[in-house]
Regions:
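Short, acidic loop-to-helix structural element flanking the phosphoryl-transfer center
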Residues: 9-35, 43, 47, 85
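Short acidic, glycine/proline-rich loop/turn micro-motifs
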Residues: 3-9, 73-77
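Asp-based phosphoryl-transfer active-site loop
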Residues: 1-3, 121
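C-terminal cap/substrate-recognition subdomain and adjoining C-terminal extension
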Residues: 42-318
Length: 318
């Protein structure tokens, strides 16, 4: 799994964490899911960010930060805000550079609505699947005003791609409360979510997260963020009604509850139990609304790239 970590401005012991995020990352790493962090934060913040991750008990495999100081020294001021020219080449280089050892390995990408994550990750997914070729990628990067040498590096990686479906899901945290319908243009593969329990529901159903781990995320939502059982179940219903859950594996969640109850105190124990009681009817809703991500048309990236170019957005506002 690849995950993105937002810029942290507080000290490590003061940094705010999105509800359920740290627990979900801990549980994923304990489930032997590979965690690769690609952050838009500058390299100078590495110590602070790593301290925060360690404070939360999170183990990661790779941690890539943006070389903003290097960009400034080279007078590359566009690159300071550019996400397309940073994240797409980084993703392509990481995947193609790993060679045969990652053949058949699926990725779940996690980002937020504060940057161009849905756009960049969808494009990356279509490149890896062979739907977006070298010529199209070049036109997109040129239109996005990416520096020429960065374009060349990205295209070298594109030429190394052995087409296969790589990206299973793209999870977008709605940190800025963007409406989920704004992401429909990217298809069902992109899953907008409001809290990390919703992300846990998705990755559990995808087979990446054990049911006991999902329940621990739910328990944290009660203990630290004052969710009750009804709110926990509504989180499932919200994702289900938007067509991102199949309504499977509810039996696993029910079966895992007794084990969780041995280690979780009140009120989390009662609220999680209430959530589990409410999930079966919501699973029926999920089965009725499920939208398979396969076979959807590719987004018009050439049209979309203007929306995600910071300079274009700035001109449009003036």
């Amino acid at each position: 799994m690849r995950d993105l970590v937002r810029t942290a401005l507080e000290r490590a012991d003061e940094k705010r964490t999105n509800p359920g995020a740290a627990t979900l990352l801990r549980e994923l790493s304990q489930a032997n899911v590979s965690i690769h962090i690609l952050s838009g934060s500058p390299e100078q913040m590495r110590r602070r960010l790593e301290a925060k991750l360690k404070l939360d008990g999170i183990v990661w495999d790779n941690f890539t930060l943006k070389p903003n100081l290097q960009n400034m020294l080279r007078l590359r001021f566009r690159a300071l805000r550019d996400q397309l020219g940073y994240k797409l080449p980084a993703l392509l280089t990481s995947r193609t550079g790993a060679g045969e050892q990652v053949a058949g390995v699926k990725e779940t990408l996690v980002g937020d609505d504060a940057e161009a994550d849905a756009f960049v990750y969808s494009l990356y997914a279509d490149v890896m699947e062979g739907r977006a070729g070298e010529e199209l990628v070049q036109r997109i990067l040129e239109r996005g005003r990416v520096y020429e040498d960065v374009i060349e590096a990205a295209l070298r990686s594109v030429r190394l791609v052995k087409p296969e479906p790589v990206v299973e899901r793209i999870l977008i945290h709605l940190e800025q409360q963007t409406h989920p319908r704004d992401f429909q243009i990217f298809g069902a593969r992109v899953v907008p979510f409001y809290n990390y329990l919703q992300a846990a529901y998705v990755v559990h159903e995808d087979g990446r997260l054990p049911a006991t781990s999902l329940l621990r995320v739910a328990a944290e939502m009660v203990t630290l963020h004052r969710f009750d059982g009804d709110a926990l179940a509504r989180s499932y219903a919200d994702v289900a009604k938007r067509g991102h859950l199949q309504g499977t594996k509810i039996e696993e969640i029910v079966a895992a509850l007794p084990e969780l109850e041995k280690t979780v105190a009140s009120p989390a124990r009662e609220e999680v139990r209430r959530m589990v009681e409410l999930l079966p009817p919501q699973a029926e809703l999920a089965r009725a609304r499920w939208k398979p991500p396969e076979g959807e048309p590719m987004p018009d990236y050439l049209e979309l790239v203007d929306r995600h170019n910071p300079r274009h957005r700035k001109r449009k506002k003036t």
